[in-house]
């Protein structure tokens, strides 16, 4: 793993706006009881539908905790552009709790 010794802004990196072109979308499978009734059961079909719609034009990385990863992998087994990653999560709002990238004026991603 590479560790950077400076802050991204010091090297000309910035957080891109949501509407800017990007490589793909990170989603998190909804299961958290504090956010979703019945372990997300009623929200999961909508998340699957949204992921498939997004995957028509870009890569989707769907994060799922170890307890749910098998079922989520089965859900998207036939979807070539959706990649399920087994990662412990705390919520389904990837924008709030997921990974993020910064870019510079040359399009370099960090």
Predicted regions and their residues:
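Histidine/cysteine-enriched polar flanking segments
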Residues: 1-110
């Amino acid at each position: 793993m590479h560790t950077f010794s400076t802050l991204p802004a010091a090297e000309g990196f910035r957080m891109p706006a949501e509407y800017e072109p990007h490589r793909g979308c990170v989603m998190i499978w909804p299961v958290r009881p504090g956010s979703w009734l019945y372990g997300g059961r009623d929200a999961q079909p909508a998340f699957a539908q949204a992921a498939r719609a997004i995957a028509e034009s870009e890569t989707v990385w769907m994060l799922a905790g170890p307890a749910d990863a098998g079922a989520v992998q089965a859900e998207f087994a036939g979807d070539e552009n959706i990649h399920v990653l087994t990662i412990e999560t705390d919520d389904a709002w990837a924008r709030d709790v997921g990974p993020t990238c910064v870019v510079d004026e040359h399009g370099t991603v960090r």
